[in-house]
Amino acid sequence: MIDSHIHSYYSKHAIGTIEEIVVSAIEKNIKYLTITDHAPFLIDKNNRLQDYELKYYFEDINTVQSKYSKDITILKGLEVDFVPKYISYTENLISDMNLDFLIGSIHFIFFENERINIWDIHKIHDEKVVSKYFLYLKELILSGLFDSIGHPDAILRGGIDEKIYYEKFFPLIKLMKLKNTSYELNTSGLRKSTYDINTNSENNGIWNYPCKSLLSTLNNNNIS
């Protein structure tokens, strides 16, 4: 079993040290584990690594890689926020990092006078937000910086039709093949609420992501 998206207490919204996470993964018979805490960024600084913590973060990963090498393969990674206008910041941040795996995720969508967060589920069904989200996805892939797209279908929490998501994402598959970018199968959507456009309410217990209808298409196109 493989887990390529995991956060420790370094991400501030998660709990557990890196070693505690590794021990738990071994108990669950996970054989490959990629530590991918949230990288430093220009905004939302309270939910991620701080610049000064990177040294300790990488040291902790090096320690568990050595200590548990007989039990599990541990990879060194980060989850990086992708915003086109801040791409130079991202390039500079990762330029001298010797990472095994890099996730690019879209958490923020910018307009002239507004920032929409991907967790603002009552806003992300808006047509202009959806269009810009897919523009960001395209630019993320074309940047060639990332091994995987983090939770690409998280926008389904906003209540948009899965068919719309499928139709908008399908043209990006050829770009993913060109750039050798993976599609993350993120199951956190199974425990998160979904916005109901008709009732203007959040509902639990409804499958929102991953996008079921897209999975077979990705598999048929050899997208991992």
Placement of each model-derived feature along the sequence:
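An N-terminally biased module of ancient metal coordination in phosphate/nucleic-acid-related enzymes
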Residues: 1-84, 94, 158, 163-167, ...
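Domain-core and long-helix interface of multi-subunit machines
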Residues: 12, 96-97, 104-221
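Short acidic/histidine-rich active-site segments
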Residues: 38, 223-224
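Active-site gating/metal-coordination segments in enzymes
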Residues: 67-113, 127-128
